Amino acid sequence: MSTAQSDALTFECETGNYHTFCPISCVSWLYQKIEDSFFLVIGTKTCGYFLQNAMGVMIFAEPRYAMAELEEGDISAKLNDYGELRRLCLQIKKDRNPSVIFWIGTCTTEIIKMDLEGIAPKLEAEIRVPIVVARANGLDYAFTQGEDTVLAAMAQRCPLNLKNQSDNTSLKTSPHIPLVLFGSLPDPVVTQLTMELKKQGIFVSGWLPSKRYTELPVIKEGYYVAGVNPFLSRTATTLMRRRKTKLIGAPFPIGPDGTRAWIEKICSVMNVKPIGLEDREKAIWASLEDYISLIRGKSVFFMGDNLLEVSLARFLTRCGMTVYEIGIPYMDKRYQAAELALLKATCDKMNVMMPTIVEKPDNYNQVDRIRDLKPDLVITGMAHANPLEARGINTKWSVEFTFAQIHGFTNARDILELVTRPLRRNLSLSELGWDVYSKQS
Amino acid sequence: MKLAYWMYAGPAHIGTLRIASSFKKVHAIMHAPLGDDYFNVMRSMLERDRDFTPVTASVVDRHVLARGSQEKVVENITRKDREESPDLVILTPTCTSSILQEDLQNFVSRASIETEADVLLADVNHYRVNELQAGDRTLEQIVTFYMEKAKSNNQVLTQKTKTPSVNIIGAVSLGFHNQHDIAELKRLFQDLDIQINQIIPENASVQDLKKLPSAWFNFIPYRETGLMTARYLEKEFNMPYVDITPMGIVQTAACIRSIQQLVNALGAAVDYEKYIDEQTRFISQSAWFSRSIDCQNLTGKKAIVFGDATHAAAITRILHQEMGIHVAWCGTYCKYDEEWFKDQVQEFCDEVIVSDDHGLIGDLIAKTEPAAIFGTQMERHIGKRLNIPCGVISSPVHIQNFPLSYRPFLGYEGTNQIADLVYNSFTLGMEDHLLEIFGGHDTTEALSIGISAVDSINWSEEAQKELNKIPGFVRGKVKRNTEKFARDCSKNLITLEVMYEAKEKVSS
């Protein structure tokens, strides 16, 4: 069976001319996740325009985020940064009374070298609201990496001891060294993954981030930590280096294969023998058969924009798809080591070529390759989706994978629901015989 | 610094990109950090564009901060020249890149030595002008560039056409109902026997710009884009222009009369009065509609208007003059055009508001409590919250404001569309009366037995909480599926475990 056609993983790096969301977009899901927070994005009209358009209707629901829009006086340092931020934060405190204010630094604050990290502690002491600074800018990061910068900053704020000894019970009863998971997930998914581990006798003593800033988990030296998303390498580094925790390097719980591998790795570190995992995985695969039969033997091309690409490619390979290319904004080979190993093992197992991983892709070149390869499905950003559809190529917007629930056994079906949707829809349309809708070549 | 949740007009480079991407074979390169190419998403999503948006970024990253972006920008311009062979490449700075104070003009000059295409640097200041002003300026810049070029090659077509002809200036990508408006204008000019010389910038070629002066006059349908170009052409080539927006019956007539006066002054002998009368009374439905008894119910109803200068002014006039509606206040976010706006609407409303602060507009609406709002998508959402109907009449807009069907706001068909929009925004006349007489809708509770009420399945407190977290529009389905699953495996308490088991096993 496993006559491996592939040797090692091949990595390429292109020009970085690709479309992705600005990392400040993390504000849109993090403000909903952290219920007592307020996010202040310190930037220009361009940042604000992106947020208001990308977040669509959400903007009208009185969001707990706003722009501190820089004006000419701020750029030329005619105005005093401290005074300006103080004025705005006092107003936010008065209007919303949050438990924490996040300052999201942008490209502009980087270029004019506004000392947010220096100002924050002083202002925090003065107005008595915690201020956490994250530099989620487009000079350094792409899309989901924004969350990474915020969580890395939050990791420093996790308490060393519980203030209230009475709710210490969960830690005391834990039969193993405490485990803290990191990555922002919708509450139902948090519950699902926590329960999945509980079945194996593993207790999650906290999540970074928690539902409220005031409930950030205790993180002490020697604790174990595990990531749930592939784009959290800075957070992982911070937890290891600054908080002296031990990182469990595992594939990510995306797809039944990933979820099982994730749990198994955690169990092995905790010296727990996993029970019933194999059967559970099998049952999930069986329940997915109706969707898998639609994509088995088909090909997929990831243009790359959100760093979930390797995990999704690995899952889709296991579903029987051929992956032509994995475009990805940034590849941390250390943090994703276990995921990359599982990708390789999956390719061997399914007897398919290892796809090329293209870091910092060049969208123009990619469209050329897509024309040559004619994949059955292209997973891409919204800038390219309609033009590709008009040329008869099935596409799925990559952004949906970041907003849908895709983690754990329970949500494997949701990933396939997304992946198969264009195929299911276009199957009926192709019978009409109009595949190309553009007069350009 | 300004605390801002929402803005009516976007940053300057968006205006430049809207102009550049409207022309054929013009490619824009943004000097911008990763993620600033959101314009491509808007084109592709809102306009459902079938083709790749001709905009790429020359990405500003850490390396650029350290070393400058000269090589990169020049390389990106020459690369696009090879790949797409455009007629023109426009380099546009963004908010971020403009503070780097690199000599972009120098890069443009250097690149243009190596390119087949012309190369221009968009002349916009990100901290002083907004999207609309930048668009106006960029169009003028491109037209000026090609007119100057044609002049030095002696290629300007100054010979006027034999019969009256016009250039329509200001049809722009991502403009509010622009494409429909332009189609309607073409029809109008055809009716008036005026030949259309050129329509710019949408779908135009920069190579044809040298033919602009052969038209008798220029027509500027929207205040926001085209005026600067019209003034340039007036100064350089002595071309007159008409800038009365033909929106509404009265203004359309005023616009046509102004055209008549203009072409007659240039030697034509036309009389459009009969055409105006025929269109107004018998072809367009809206004048008759205003007169019909149904429309009487709108008399004196209170409305407010907010939008860009063109649309807010025109709609205010229509509501007041043509429909007898009381406009409590009308406003615009085009602060730079305040004087013109006030002058236009002063006599048609109680108060004029000029502000780009949506919080202030929201508060004012709440205080005014109008029967209907005519505004942008922002006012629509304010209306939703206050339970006041809203007709969307101006950008900024969402995807539903890019309708597939024919919906012009300009010309005689436009008057029909606007009449429908206004009428449908108010609670219908008769319904209104009946509700008043009978004191609201029938409130007797409908007798119905829900499926889930048949047998008793209990939800644990935890599961119930989880259920409540599920968004409202799918909650019912999840509840039914879960209960069916529990019933099928004879469980009468739904716990979190049961809930997720159901999700895994019941294929939705």
Swiss-Prot record, chain A:
Report the co-factor binding details: Binds 1 [4Fe-4S] cluster per heterodimer. The cluster is bound at the heterodimer interface by residues from both subunits.
Q: What is its EC number?
A: 1.3.7.7
Q: Chief location of this protein?
A: plastid
Q: Which CDD domains match?
A: Pchlide_reductase_N
The answer on whether this UniProt entry bears the keyword Glycosyltransferase reads no
- Coiled-coil features, chain-numbered ranges: none
Q: Which Gene3D superfamilies match?
A: Nitrogenase molybdenum iron protein domain (3.40.50.1980)
Q: Which residues form the signal peptide?
A: none
| EC main group | oxidoreductase
Q: Could you say which cofactors this protein requires?
A: [4Fe-4S] cluster
GO term, biological process aspect, one: light-independent chlorophyll biosynthetic process
Asked whether the keyword Cytoplasm is assigned, the reply is no
Q: Where in the cell is it found?
A: Plastid, Chloroplast
Molecular function, one GO term:
oxidoreductase activity, acting on the CH-CH group of donors, iron-sulfur protein as acceptor
Q: Could you list this entry's UniProt keywords, alphabetically sorted.
A: 4Fe-4S, ATP-binding, Chlorophyll biosynthesis, Chloroplast, Iron, Iron-sulfur, Metal-binding, Nucleotide-binding, Oxidoreductase, Photosynthesis, Plastid
**Binding positions for [4Fe-4S] cluster per the UniProt entry:** 22, 47, 107
Q: Which SUPFAM superfamilies match?
A: Helical backbone' metal receptor
Pathway the protein takes part in: Porphyrin-containing compound metabolism; chlorophyll biosynthesis (light-independent)
**Superkingdom, taxonomy of origin:** Eukaryota
Catalysed reaction(s) here are: chlorophyllide a + oxidized 2[4Fe-4S]-[ferredoxin] + 2 ADP + 2 phosphate = protochlorophyllide a + reduced 2[4Fe-4S]-[ferredoxin] + 2 ATP + 2 H2O
Q: What does this protein do?
A: Component of the dark-operative protochlorophyllide reductase (DPOR) that uses Mg-ATP and reduced ferredoxin to reduce ring D of protochlorophyllide (Pchlide) to form chlorophyllide a (Chlide). This reaction is light-independent. The NB-protein (ChlN-ChlB) is the catalytic component of the complex.
The entry's family comment says: Belongs to the BchN/ChlN family.
Quote the subunit structure annotation: Protochlorophyllide reductase is composed of three subunits; ChlL, ChlN and ChlB. Forms a heterotetramer of two ChlB and two ChlN subunits.
Q: What is this protein called?
A: Light-independent protochlorophyllide reductase subunit N
Name the gene: chlN
From Swiss-Prot, chain B:
Cofactor(s) essential for the protein: [4Fe-4S] cluster
Its UniProt pathway annotation is: Porphyrin-containing compound metabolism; chlorophyll biosynthesis (light-independent)
Catalytic activity field: chlorophyllide a + oxidized 2[4Fe-4S]-[ferredoxin] + 2 ADP + 2 phosphate = protochlorophyllide a + reduced 2[4Fe-4S]-[ferredoxin] + 2 ATP + 2 H2O
Question: Which leading EC class covers this enzyme?
Answer: oxidoreductase
One record GO biological process: photosynthesis, dark reaction
What are the positions of the active site?
Answer: 294
Q: Which UniProt keywords apply?
A: 4Fe-4S, ATP-binding, Chlorophyll biosynthesis, Chloroplast, Iron, Iron-sulfur, Metal-binding, Nucleotide-binding, Oxidoreductase, Photosynthesis, Plastid
The annotation note on the cofactor reads:
Binds 1 [4Fe-4S] cluster per heterodimer. The cluster is bound at the heterodimer interface by residues from both subunits.
Entry keyword annotation includes Transport: no
Q: Write out the residues that bind [4Fe-4S] cluster.
A: 36
UniProt-recorded Gene Ontology molecular function terms: 4 iron, 4 sulfur cluster binding; ATP binding; metal ion binding; oxidoreductase activity, acting on iron-sulfur proteins as donors; oxidoreductase activity, acting on the CH-CH group of donors, iron-sulfur protein as acceptor
EC numbers: 1.3.7.7
Family annotation (InterPro entries): ChlB/BchB/BchZ, LI-POR_suB-like_C, Nase/OxRdtase_comp1, P-CP_red_C, Protochl_reductB, Protochlorophyllide_Rdtase
Binding locations of substrate: 429-430
An example of a Gene Ontology cellular component annotation for this protein is: chloroplast
Q: Where does this polypeptide localize? A: Plastid, Chloroplast
Leader sequence range is none
What PANTHER family does the record point to? LIGHT-INDEPENDENT PROTOCHLOROPHYLLIDE REDUCTASE SUBUNIT B
Tell me which family the UniProt entry assigns to this protein: Belongs to the ChlB/BchB/BchZ family.
Q: What does this protein do?
A: Component of the dark-operative protochlorophyllide reductase (DPOR) that uses Mg-ATP and reduced ferredoxin to reduce ring D of protochlorophyllide (Pchlide) to form chlorophyllide a (Chlide). This reaction is light-independent. The NB-protein (ChlN-ChlB) is the catalytic component of the complex.
Tell me how this protein assembles.
Protochlorophyllide reductase is composed of three subunits; ChlL, ChlN and ChlB. Forms a heterotetramer of two ChlB and two ChlN subunits.
Q: What is this protein called?
A: Light-independent protochlorophyllide reductase subunit B
Instruction: Look up and give the organism this protein is from.
Output: Pyropia yezoensis
Organism taxonomic ancestry: Eukaryota, Rhodophyta, Bangiophyceae, Bangiales, Bangiaceae
The record's gene field reads chlB
